[in-house]
Amino acid sequence: VKMKPSQGHNNTIINGIPRIGWMTGGKSALWTDEDIADVITDKAKNFITAHKDEPFFLYMGTQDVHVPRVPHPRFAGKSGLGVRGDVILQLDWTVGEIMHTLDSLGIADNTIFVFCSDNGPVIDDGYQDQARELLNGHTPMKHYRGGKYSAFDAGTRIPFIVRWPNGIKPGKQQAPFSMIDVYASFAALLNHPLEAGIAPDSRDQLNNFLGTDTAGCDYIVQQNLDNTLSIIQGAVSYTHLRAHETKANLV
């Protein structure tokens, strides 16, 4: 194999890399990790081009910076921070390709572009890829406790960047905002009333999203992989530990 597992990723081998679980499907179900970024990016660019003259919604999920971290040869060894750094470079290229497509088609000013993550950072996530050894002083969690899978702040604080030249002035927004509130906020932006029972946990935070509200939402509820709950209100974060839980299995 070309990438050895550290824990849990030791089942079906595809593209020379052992995976989580067992997979079947024959040749048509196989893939090459090094090409995933190019394939997804090209499909997204083609979709945008095909729908440039009409309203469209595109959700684009990338493989980067998730494991297994296998960058295209264009990026392999270029960061000086190992494969984790290399796939971050690859992700940066992907974002640039999408933004360039919007610019070249002349629709960037009236397109809402959102970049975000689904969880906080994780370094060793199942493969012996030297991600931790090659951080070179970088601290992805900063000073926060926890990380991916955790209900602590480093597990749920994520990058959230919005570009919409016609609607949002460039700047930084420090007001708290939850991904759950994107649904109701976009509905408000589109003047689309939500029927009873639709996205009941989502709150309209449009002014926060647009950067005109400095207060933000009153509270944010967080949940980890083991269903441990925490709540953030102002400068206070409370995590509720159940009787059988310890600090070790929350981090």
Question: Language-model segments: what does each one mean?
Answer:
Residues 1-29, 221:
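Catalytic-site neighborhoods of secreted/periplasmic enzymes
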Residues 90-128:
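Metal-dependent active-site segment of extracytoplasmic phospho-/sulfohydrolases and closely related
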Residues 24, 96-105, 133-199, 203-214:
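Substrate-binding rim/cap in mid-to-C-terminal beta-strand-loop elements of soluble/periplasmic
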Residues 18-29, 73-78, 163-167:
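Short glycine/proline-rich turn/loop motifs
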Residues 59-68, 115-123, 201-202, 221-226:
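Short, solvent-exposed turn/loop segments enriched in Gly/Ser/Thr/Pro and often Arg
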Residues 39, 44-87, 122-124, 128-129:
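Active-site His/acidic residue clusters
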Residues 52-58, 107-113, 216-217, 234-236:
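Loop/turn elements at helix/coil->beta-strand transitions in domains of secreted/extracellular proteins
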Residues 239-246:
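Conserved small/polar residues in nucleotide/adenosyl-binding loops
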